[in-house]
Structure formats: structure tokens, C-alpha cells
Amino acid sequence: MKINHVAIYVNNLEKTKEFYVKYFQAKANEKYHNKNTGLQTYFLSFPDSETRLEIMTRPELSGREDRAMNEGFIHLAFSVGSKEKVDELTERLVKDSFRCLSGPRTTGDGYYESVVEDCEGNLLEITE
């Protein structure tokens, strides 16, 4: 058994798609738009991964405050292959004004990682 995809709602579908394309080398499928419900989605595929990220939006979405302290979904983790790549990507995101919540650092359980927010405030863990 394996995870096929994870889906998240976002407010700005196009901006979110471009974020993952630019920083995580995602490839997007053709946008799906259900004219009856207003739902719009992209499936994003990533190099060397079979698991996809589905980003979705609809007109009636409302935001949540303090996402890190809610039950349920906490973060997505991306393995980039080395400590140097963790450092480089984290530095690039911070330079482009995305918020870094921690790291890069070695955690108590031995992982080298940083935690940043994407353009929608979703938490991303960048690991080696």
C-alpha cells in the first residue's frame, strides 16, 4: 500500500501552483474546473516521487487561524537529498520573503530540517 496523493484547499490556486513549480520542481496537470460547484484543482507531481499533491479551491473557502495548533493536517515534508540542499532552498525561500519557523537544524531525533510556510501559510518541512 502507498499514499497516492494528499489534497489541500488553498485560496489562490494559481499562486500556489506557481510556488510549488518554482521551489519544488512540481509539474502540474491541466486544471480541472467543475462549473456547477466552482471547484478548481491541480494535481502536482514531484521528481522522484509517486505521491502527488492536489491543490484545490472553491468560492466559499474561509481561512483558519493558527494552523500549527489545530488537530488534523500539520505539514508536508519534502526530502531534497542533502543538508546543503536544505540550506539552499531554505535560504532561497527566506530571501523571497517566505517565513521560516525553524532551522535549518538537526532535530533531537536526528533529522536535518527546516520548517517554512508556503504562499498560503501551509507548513512545509524541508529535510535532507
Task: Describe the role of every protein-language-model region.
Residues 9-51, 57:
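Core segments of cupin and vicinal oxygen chelate
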Residues 17-18, 53, 87, 124:
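Alpha-helical elements of the RecA-like P-loop NTPase motor core of helicases
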Residues 36, 47, 68-70, 106:
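A generic structural micro-feature
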Residues 48-52, 61, 83-86:
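Short, charged/polar surface micro-motifs in flexible loops or helix N-caps
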Residues 3-11, 42, 64-128:
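Vicinal oxygen chelate
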Residues 1-2, 128:
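Absolute protein N-terminus
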Residues 56-62, 128:
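Acetyl-CoA-dependent GNAT
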